[in-house]
């Protein structure tokens, strides 16, 4: 490796952004094909390609940051700014869904019966599964903070336990959400109520799955002694992301489940 007289990481050429983009294209196109033609071939191909890309890209970043020492303090600072900007872009992404929901619900058109929820829609009880989901997600926010503090204090076993607990709570939330979708008395095709409900809560559910995988990678890395109390940006980024998912759910619960019902 050539000697460099600066603290910045000159990233080597990598195929993963391209394979990741192709995987995402196949996944979204496959989803549309599955909805309309009941064929899961392209969807499965996209999912496999995306999972392989994730595995190999994560592997490369772990090699560069943990074993080759490329993640110097200035590089970590850049990664922090990058994560903050990414979460900010996600805030605006969800803002669009809330805008659609409030636009439709605050001034319901005569076609909807002039009321909200629209005529013929039976909304879900906000004090049943949605309230349990809120408790589960808030508890996972506590456990991820416990994991972070344990990591900073060098309490390795506690960090592993807290991380494992957070992932279990994330999986439990996803299972409850899937059950709620299965038993919902309305579908995504039931006008503006169905579409805003399922798109907003569905994208949030997708973010919970992404966050759970992010934390699962952190758990594996913590088990393999990759993190130290000073050097654990991968975990920090996962924790920020998880707290963001937490806060979005609180807004979804108050807006769509409680006020919207």
Swiss-Prot record:
Origin superkingdom: Eukaryota
PROSITE patterns: COX3
Mitochondrial intermembrane side: 35-40, 106-128, 184-190, 257-261
Cellular component, GO annotation: mitochondrial inner membrane; respiratory chain complex IV
GO biological process, one term: mitochondrial electron transport, cytochrome c to oxygen
Main location: mitochondrion
Mitochondrial matrix side: 1-15, 67-72, 153-155, 224-232
Enzyme class: translocase
SUPFAM superfamilies: Cytochrome c oxidase subunit III-like (SSF81452)
Presence of the UniProt keyword Kinase in the record: no
Localization in the cell: Mitochondrion inner membrane
Membrane topology field: Multi-pass membrane protein
Transmembrane feature ranges: 16-34, 41-66, 73-105, 129-152, 156-183, 191-223, 233-256
Enzyme Commission numbers on file: 7.1.1.9
Function description: Component of the cytochrome c oxidase, the last enzyme in the mitochondrial electron transport chain which drives oxidative phosphorylation. The respiratory chain contains 3 multisubunit complexes succinate dehydrogenase (complex II, CII), ubiquinol-cytochrome c oxidoreductase (cytochrome b-c1 complex, complex III, CIII) and cytochrome c oxidase (complex IV, CIV), that cooperate to transfer electrons derived from NADH and succinate to molecular oxygen, creating an electrochemical gradient over the inner membrane that drives transmembrane transport and the ATP synthase.
Subunit note: Component of the cytochrome c oxidase (complex IV, CIV), a multisubunit enzyme composed of 14 subunits. The complex is composed of a catalytic core of 3 subunits MT-CO1, MT-CO2 and MT-CO3, encoded in the mitochondrial DNA, and 11 supernumerary subunits COX4I, COX5A, COX5B, COX6A, COX6B, COX6C, COX7A, COX7B, COX7C, COX8 and NDUFA4, which are encoded in the nuclear genome.
Protein name per Swiss-Prot or TrEMBL: Cytochrome c oxidase subunit 3
Organism: Formosania lacustris (Oriental stream loach)
């Amino acid at each position: 490796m050539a000697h460099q007289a600066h603290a910045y990481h000159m990233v080597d050429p990598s195929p993963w952004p391209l394979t990741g983009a192709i995987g995402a294209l196949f996944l979204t196109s496959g989803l549309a094909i599955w909805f309309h033609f009941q064929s899961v071939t392209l969807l499965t191909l996209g999912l496999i390609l995306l999972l392989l890309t994730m595995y190999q890209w994560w592997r490369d970043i772990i090699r560069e940051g943990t074993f080759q020492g490329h993640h110097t303090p200035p590089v970590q600072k850049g990664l922090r700014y990058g994560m903050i900007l990414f979460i900010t872009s996600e805030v605006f992404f969800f803002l669009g869904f809330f805008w659609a929901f409030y636009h439709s619900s605050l001034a319901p058109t005569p076609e909807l019966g002039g009321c909200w929820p629209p005529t013929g829609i039976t909304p879900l009880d906000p004090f049943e599964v949605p309230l349990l989901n809120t408790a589960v997600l808030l508890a996972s926010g506590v456990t991820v903070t416990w994991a972070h503090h344990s990591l900073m204090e060098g309490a390795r076993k506690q960090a592993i336990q807290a991380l494992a607990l957070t992932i279990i709570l994330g999986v439990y939330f996803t299972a409850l959400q899937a059950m709620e979708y299965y038993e919902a008395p309305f579908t995504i095709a039931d006008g503006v109520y169905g579409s805003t409900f399922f798109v907003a809560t569905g994208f949030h559910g997708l973010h919970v799955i992404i966050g759970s995988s992010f934390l699962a990678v952190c758990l594996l890395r913590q088990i393999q002694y990759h993190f130290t109390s000073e050097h654990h940006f991968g975990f920090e980024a996962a924790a920020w992301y998880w707290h963001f998912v937490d806060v979005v759910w609180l807004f979804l619960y108050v807006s769509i489940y409680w006020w919207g019902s």
